[in-house]
């Protein structure tokens, strides 16, 4: 059995297959998944799992170079934004880029996979750009 926190087989497989610059999206329950992009559906019910818990577990296995958020998250100020800022301050997310929510949805078309959580706070979506460990 794995020793790291991430136990989901599909998610672990996708992270292990990422190359430098590849994108993994973690989204709330309402984020549309583009046709042809793999969906890893973790959602059980509203709020379970929450966005931040899923993100923290992904970060336990993924080297992140940068991340993209929809700028609307700054307007709505969901509680998850404080956690995102903390992770940014800890350098776990690399450089931040803000785009419109529509541009974020277009970016998700390039993702290797979209991880759907049960999160129901507005704009709790992040595109993680894979880095390298060397």
From Swiss-Prot:
Its EC number is 5.4.99.62. It is an enzyme of class 5 (isomerase). Catalyzes the interconversion of beta-pyran and beta-furan forms of D-ribose. Keywords: Carbohydrate metabolism, Cytoplasm, Isomerase. Its main location: cytoplasm. This is D-ribose pyranase. It catalyses: beta-D-ribopyranose = beta-D-ribofuranose. The active site is at residue 20. SUPFAM superfamilies: RbsD-like (SSF102546). Homodecamer. InterPro entries: D-ribose_pyranase (IPR023064), RbsD-like_sf (IPR023750), RbsD_FucU (IPR007721). GO terms for cellular component: cytosol. The keyword NAD does not apply. One of its GO terms (biological process) is D-ribose catabolic process. Substrate binds at residues 28, 101, 123-125. It is found in: Cytoplasm. The keyword Isomerase applies. GO terms for molecular function: D-ribose pyranase activity; intramolecular lyase activity; monosaccharide binding. It holds the Pfam family RbsD_FucU. HAMAP family: D_rib_pyranase (MF_01661). It comes from the Bacteria. Belongs to the RbsD / FucU family. RbsD subfamily.
């Amino acid at each position: 059995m794995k020793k790291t926190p991430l136990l989901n087989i599909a998610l672990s497989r996708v992270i292990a297959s990422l190359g430098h610059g590849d994108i993994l999206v973690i989204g709330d329950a309402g984020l549309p998944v583009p046709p042809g992009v793999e969906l890893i559906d973790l959602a059980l019910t509203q709020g379970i799992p929450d966005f931040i818990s899923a993100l923290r577990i992904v970060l336990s296995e993924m080297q992140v170079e940068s991340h993209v958020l929809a700028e609307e998250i700054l307007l709505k100020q969901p509680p998850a934004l404080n956690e995102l800022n903390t992770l940014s301050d800890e350098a776990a997310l690399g450089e931040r880029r803000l785009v419109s929510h529509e541009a974020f949805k277009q970016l998700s078309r390039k993702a290797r996979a979209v991880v759907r959580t049960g999160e129901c706070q507005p704009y709790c979506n992040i595109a993680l750009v894979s880095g390298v460990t060397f």
